[in-house]
């Protein structure tokens, strides 16, 4: 097999898949007119079911825990999905750069649908978690690729609006998810929370295949080419044409196998330590300490390997596709890492707020899953409004950092107000405190991704691959924050609840695990102002205090973000992309 080297933007775009051009205008592969809007609609549908799978789970936790009897494992209904979602984001970006966007997205949808089917048919908590993990593998690709594809179909000026449109899928799912999930759980069965992904995913595949033309080929021509390739395949031909040494080098260096393995193992061990601490094992036990310390060390070593050791072992330094997943030139660039830390911190706090806002109404007021989900409508409506406003403002005025700071300020104020939500607060307070966190995330997330993309040097030969990987890294940080938010919030709640119950010496709860305490509470509800109701309220408030800390750190990073603005062309300039003046 011949050695592949790249020396021009055209060759780089070929390495990224021919549909990976940064300059959408003038690319034969980019949809135009109605096809563009339908293609964006298909990507939005894909992101909708991806987000739905995160948010709908919050409404089934108590029902599933009661059916399978493992409340402490319910945290893994979120983590089992969001952890592979985070870890594999970078891999999907690299995978798409090799085989192209279209094939990667279709594969990701199929994996996601398979995971949803497994979860829907689950007969035990472990099987349900396994289905969530499989769905998370596919969901990781969907989140990464939808933003990459959407951003590369239009010019730079229209990217903020596209990012906002795609982000609205998450916000709409946050409204619909708890309502649909609650309705299914209360009136039908929680299994339909996963069955619903199947028809929506199928529709998204059809729309995408009909509107997105990779290599300027229609879907029928692509199917014909694929059949021809498969029919001409023979093992002897494969054996003679493939250099297995180069194949192994491709796996190790194109996909950064060792860096990925170290990073994944580190994150998994660290999150296991947080999950087991205070539940299965005490915090000072050797098992928990080993998980936490070893997890941190492996993660640090993965960074050392990618930043300093990868190039020393790289057999083909001139091959642009042989590069680490976490490229020091990009990831360690202050302007990029700062805005991605904003994404990570705000998503950590926001996910904790979302999960325990639902738990607040279910555990304290014994609300059904459906009614508890309705309380999230304020936080989601404001998220949609802010996301759209952010995209329009950036497209028209080019502002990025002001929106980032504005979102950070609203996040701190909103998180502070959420600590006022207790079992004695009024209905208006319970609704009002949920408004600002939605505004915060809507403004900040779009601005952070746009700010990161603006740092790419467009005249570099590998600019197209840089664009993919910066976008994938942002998705990685977003998913990692969501994952950590779910685990940490459960850890804080469980530890706080267990300690407070132990000090109160409540006879029905003494000697029970947190799982058993929660189940006993659900089966023997004694009001929102009882002793156990007060303890639950205080424990959930501690989660909200933790979220406030993450928002405060996020605002601090917002203040140090780049001052770069989106360049707005003069009115008499020719529209720069295929979303302009349609």
From Swiss-Prot:
Q: What GO molecular function terms would the record report?
A: transmembrane transporter activity
Compartment(s)? Vacuole membrane
Those parts of the protein on the Cytoplasmic side are 1-44, 102-104, 154-160, 213-256, 309-329, 394-401, 452-469, 561-582
Asked whether the keyword Iron-sulfur is assigned, the reply is no
Task: Please indicate which superkingdom the organism of origin belongs to.
Answer: Eukaryota
Q: Which Gene Ontology CC terms are recorded?
A: plasma membrane; vacuolar membrane
Any keyword Transmembrane?
yes
A biological process (GO) of this protein is:
L-arginine transmembrane transport
This protein's major location comes to membrane
Q: Which residues are glycosylated?
A: 70, 423
Q: Which residues cross the membrane?
A: 45-65, 81-101, 105-125, 133-153, 161-181, 192-212, 257-277, 288-308, 330-350, 373-393, 402-422, 431-451, 470-492, 540-560
Question: Keywords for this entry?
Answer: Amino-acid transport, Glycoprotein, Membrane, Transmembrane, Transmembrane helix, Transport, Vacuole
Membrane topology, from the record: Multi-pass membrane protein
What Pfam families would the database entry show? MFS_1 (PF07690)
Kindly give the CDD domains that the UniProt entry links to this protein: MFS_Azr1_MDR_like
Q: List the disulfide bonds.
A: none
Task: Enumerate the Vacuolar topological stretches.
Answer: 66-80, 126-132, 182-191, 278-287, 351-372, 423-430, 493-539
Role according to the record: Transporter required for vacuolar uptake of basic amino acids.
Q: Which family does it belong to?
A: Belongs to the major facilitator superfamily.
Protein name in the entry: Vacuolar basic amino acid transporter 5
Q: Which organism is it from?
A: Saccharomyces cerevisiae (strain ATCC 204508 / S288c) (Baker's yeast)
Q: Print the organism lineage.
A: Eukaryota, Fungi, Dikarya, Ascomycota, Saccharomycotina
């Amino acid at each position: 097999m011949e050695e592949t080297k790249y020396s021009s933007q055209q060759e780089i775009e070929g390495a990224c898949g021919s549909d990976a051009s940064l300059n959408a205008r003038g690319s034969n592969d980019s949809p135009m007119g109605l096809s563009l809007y339908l293609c964006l609609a298909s990507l939005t549908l894909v992101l909708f079911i991806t987000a739905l799978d995160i948010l709908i789970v919050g409404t089934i936790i108590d029902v599933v825990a009661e059916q399978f009897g493992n409340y402490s494992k319910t945290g893994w209904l979120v983590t089992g999905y969001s952890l592979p979602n985070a870890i594999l984001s970078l891999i999907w970006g690299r995978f798409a750069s090799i085989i192209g966007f279209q094939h990667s997205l279709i594969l990701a949808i199929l994996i996601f649908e398979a995971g949803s089917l497994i979860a829907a048919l689950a007969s035990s908590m472990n099987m349900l978690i396994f289905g969530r993990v499989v769905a998370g593998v596919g969901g990781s690709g969907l989140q990464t690729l939808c933003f990459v594809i959407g951003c590369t179909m239009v010019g730079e000026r229209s990217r903020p609006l596209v990012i906002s449109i795609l982000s609205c899928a998450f916000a709409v799912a946050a409204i619909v998810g708890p309502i649909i999930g609650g309705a299914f759980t209360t009136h039908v069965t929680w299994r339909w929370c996963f069955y619903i992904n199947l028809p929506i995913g199928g529709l998204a595949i059809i729309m995408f295949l009909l509107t997105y033309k990779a290599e300027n080929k229609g879907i029928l021509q692509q199917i014909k080419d694929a059949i021809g390739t498969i029919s001409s395949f023979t093992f002897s031909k494969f054996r003679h044409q493939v250099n297995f040494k180069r194949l192994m080098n491709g796996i190790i260096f194109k996909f950064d196998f060792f860096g990925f393995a170290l990073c994944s193992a580190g994150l998994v061990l660290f999150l296991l330590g947080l999950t087991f601490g205070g539940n299965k094992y005490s915090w000072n036990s050797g098992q928990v300490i080993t998980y936490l310390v070893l997890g941190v060390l492996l993660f640090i070593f993965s960074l050392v390997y990618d930043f300093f050791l990868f190039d020393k072992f790289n057999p083909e330094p001139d091959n642009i596709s042989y590069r680490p997943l976490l490229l020091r030139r990009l990831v360690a660039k202050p302007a990029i890492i700062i805005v991605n830390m904003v994404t990570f911190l705000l998503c950590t706090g926001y996910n904790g707020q979302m999960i325990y806002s639902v738990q607040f109404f279910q555990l304290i007021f014994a609300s059904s899953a459906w009614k508890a989900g309705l309380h999230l409508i304020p936080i989601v409506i404001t998220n949609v409004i802010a996301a759209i406003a952010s995209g329009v403002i950036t497209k028209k005025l080019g502002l990025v950092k002001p929106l980032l700071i504005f979102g950070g300020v609203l996040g701190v104020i909103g998180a502070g107000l959420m600590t006022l939500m207790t079992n004695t607060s009024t209905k208006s307070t319970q609704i009002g405190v949920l408004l600002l966190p939605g505004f915060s995330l809507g403004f900040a997330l779009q601005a952070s991704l746009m700010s990161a993309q603006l740092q790419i040097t467009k005249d570099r030969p590998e600019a197209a691959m840089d664009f993919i990987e910066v976008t994938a890294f942002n998705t990685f940080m977003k998913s990692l924050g969501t994952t950590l938010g779910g685990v940490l919030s459960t850890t804080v709640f469980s530890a706080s609840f267990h300690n407070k119950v132990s000090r109160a010496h409540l006879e029905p709860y003494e000697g029970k695990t947190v799982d058993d305490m929660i189940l006993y509470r659900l089966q023997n509800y004694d009001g929102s102002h009882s002793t156990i109701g007060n303890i639950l309220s205080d424990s959930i408030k501690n989660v909200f205090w933790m979220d406030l800390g993450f928002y405060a750190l996020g605002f601090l990073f917002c203040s140090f973000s780049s001052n770069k603005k989106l360049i707005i062309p003069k009115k008499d300039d020719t529209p720069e992309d295929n979303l302009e003046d349609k």
